[in-house]
């Protein structure tokens, strides 16, 4: 992954940003597993914790091609899960710019996850698993990594309400993407 152009206007107004976003094609089984796991084991904990604290829980927005019936069935009236399915590049850019947190709850899969690099490029604060962070250098600079459902949920709840930390993570993504995924960074690797 190498980028030549970078975001010119990072939306750091987290007071106006809302929702949890997942992006991934559902022809790839790890993505379906991730959304099902998040929807069944993590998202209910987030809703419970936030409602208990008198907060309105965020919507969980799912974007990706080839949505299965099992994934589509997750969206029910008033449960906060929105299955958007396939969206255009423009719509996806808008979702990245307006969501508060990107979640990548992968439990299996191999290699660098394009969805993680894409979310970093788009300035999104990201919570993922160890699997989701595989192959990402200096992962601790831009990703929050949690593997257990309760820890993942608690991290979402804590980060979601911390606008300063959200802004800080978003700013770090832009430094990070230039350091690790720019043409200059690629040339540095080749020279080594």
Where are these regions (language model features)?
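Short acidic/histidine- and often glycine-rich active-site loop of Leloir-type glycosyltransferases
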Residues: 130-144
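A charged, aromatic-enriched C-terminal amphipathic alpha-helix characteristic of glycosyltransferases
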Residues: 164-191
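Conserved acidic donor-binding segment of nucleotide-sugar-dependent glycosyltransferases
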Residues: 142-150, 158-163
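Glycosyltransferase donor-binding loop in the core domain
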Residues: 27-30, 111, 144, 178
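Short hydrophobic beta-strand element within catalytic cores of glycosyltransferases
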Residues: 115-119, 125-128
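Conserved catalytic-core segment of nucleotide-activated headgroup transferases in glycan assembly
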Residues: 1-77, 82-91, 97
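Flexible glycine-rich beta->alpha loop in the catalytic core of nucleotide-sugar glycosyltransferases
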Residues: 107-109, 125, 131-134, 150
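Acidic donor-binding loop of glycosyltransferase active sites
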Residues: 97-111, 124-125
């Amino acid at each position: 992954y190498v980028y030549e152009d970078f975001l010119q206007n990072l939306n750091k107004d987290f007071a106006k940003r809302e929702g949890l976003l997942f992006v991934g094609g559902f022809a790839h089984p790890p993505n379906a597993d991730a959304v099902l796991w998040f929807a069944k084991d993590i998202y209910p904990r987030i809703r419970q914790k936030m409602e208990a604290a008198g907060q309105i829980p965020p919507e969980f927005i799912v974007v990706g091609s080839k949505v299965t019936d099992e994934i589509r069935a997750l969206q029910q009236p008033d449960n906060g899960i929105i299955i958007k399915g396939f969206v255009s590049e423009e719509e996806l850019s808008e979702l990245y710019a307006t969501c508060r947190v990107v979640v990548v709850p992968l439990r299996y899969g191999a290699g660098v996850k394009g969805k993680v690099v894409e979310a970093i490029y788009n300035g999104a604060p990201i919570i993922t698993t160890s699997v989701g962070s595989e192959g990402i250098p200096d992962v601790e600079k831009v990703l929050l990594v949690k593997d257990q459902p309760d820890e993942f949920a608690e991290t979402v709840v804590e980060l979601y309400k911390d606008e300063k930390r959200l802004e800080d993570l978003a700013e770090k993504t832009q430094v990070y993407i230039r350091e690790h995924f720019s043409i200059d960074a690629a040339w540095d690797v080749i020279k080594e």
